[in-house]
């Protein structure tokens, strides 16, 4: 079993979630990428055992935004349903 989510999957989510962060919050690309890569949401996405990619980019963005607002990604409706 792999110890991290595939690079292709992470690259896809990096691009999609960072685009949403830039659009909604007005960050530049580098800043948005750094914010996402340093988030607990990203660490959860990179953990293959959590299978976070199943939520899609919209779900991952929602989880990240919940983390930004409340301090915990676990406050997202996506994770409360699990």
Description of each model-found segment:
Residues 1-82:
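C-terminal alpha-helical interaction appendages
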């Amino acid at each position: 079993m792999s110890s991290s989510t595939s690079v292709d999957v992470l690259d896809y989510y990096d691009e999609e979630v960072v685009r949403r962060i830039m659009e909604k919050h007005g960050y530049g690309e580098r800043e948005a990428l750094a914010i996402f890569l340093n988030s607990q949401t990203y660490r959860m996405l990179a953990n293959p055992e959590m299978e976070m990619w199943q939520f899609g980019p919209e779900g991952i963005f929602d989880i990240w935004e919940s983390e930004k607002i409340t301090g915990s990604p676990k406050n997202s409706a996506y994770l409360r349903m699990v």
